[in-house]
């Protein structure tokens, strides 16, 4: 038990994903390993988050643009969220026509074949599917459920020092840094709230299935997602 506590605190921790805000990269029913050492340690790395120190130890191990990270929600530190780092401290972020601009420069935004979403009634629905490439060369895929969604055009967000701007890959179905804290959103995320970096999908079941029902694994497990790296 002590070994398990040490591993979860300092090396990696499993997380289960609910909901669809991170499609197509991460799906509801995915189980992830999150490395706790990637950015050093803060109070939120420890069980029950005791206020033992400020900042991170060691300092200088910083998230990179495009990383998928788990963090504690600033307005409710008991809640774990997972989003992608889009804006670094000092950046100016804006979304125009569904395209992210960083410091006044639109990121590369390429249409790829539609993502096929299976609805509750069993019908397959095509969803607009994009490949986005950040200034550091990091590429990943995003979804666009509707044209001119309410977060497809925003003002300019200036990221404060020591904070990060997060976005979900399912752009029209993600509560993220585009929505401020006073509107029940994420707002800017302090460095010390970041728990770790998402690395591997070690297990995955279809939404509505229960991972502990091992007798259903032949039909409930998404076998093609096991041990998949989080990009």
Please report, for each region that a protein language model flagged, where it lies by residue.
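Hydrophobic membrane-insertion alpha-helices, especially the h-region
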Residues: 1-10
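Soluble "head" domains of membrane/secretory-pathway proteins
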Residues: 11, 15, 23-231
């Amino acid at each position: 038990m002590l070994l398990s506590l040490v591993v979860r605190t300092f090396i990696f921790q499993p997380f289960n994903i609910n909901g669809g805000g991170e499609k197509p990269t991460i799906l509801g029913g995915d189980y992830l390993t999150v490395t706790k050492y990637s950015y050093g340690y803060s109070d939120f790395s420890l069980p029950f988050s005791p206020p033992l120190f400020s900042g991170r130890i060691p300092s200088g191990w910083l998230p990179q643009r495009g990383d998928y990270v788990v963090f504690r929600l600033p307005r409710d530190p008991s809640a774990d969220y997972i989003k992608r780092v889009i804006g670094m401290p000092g950046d100016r972020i804006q979304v125009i026509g569904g395209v992210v601009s960083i410091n006044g420069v639109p990121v590369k935004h390429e249409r790829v074949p539609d993502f096929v979403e299976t609805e509750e009634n069993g019908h397959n629905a095509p969803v607009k599917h994009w490949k986005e490439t950040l200034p550091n060369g990091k590429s990943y895929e995003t979804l666009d459920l509707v044209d001119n969604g309410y977060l497809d055009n925003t003002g300019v967000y200036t990221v404060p020092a020591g904070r990060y701007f997060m976005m979900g890959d399912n752009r029209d179905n993600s509560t993220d840094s585009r929505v401020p804290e006073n509107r029940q959103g994420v707002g800017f995320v302090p460095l010390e709230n970041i728990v770790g970096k998402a690395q591997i999908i070690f297990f995955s079941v279809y939404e509505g299935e229960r991972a502990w029902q091992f007798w259903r694994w032949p039909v409930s497990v998404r076998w093609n997602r096991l041990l998949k790296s989080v990009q």
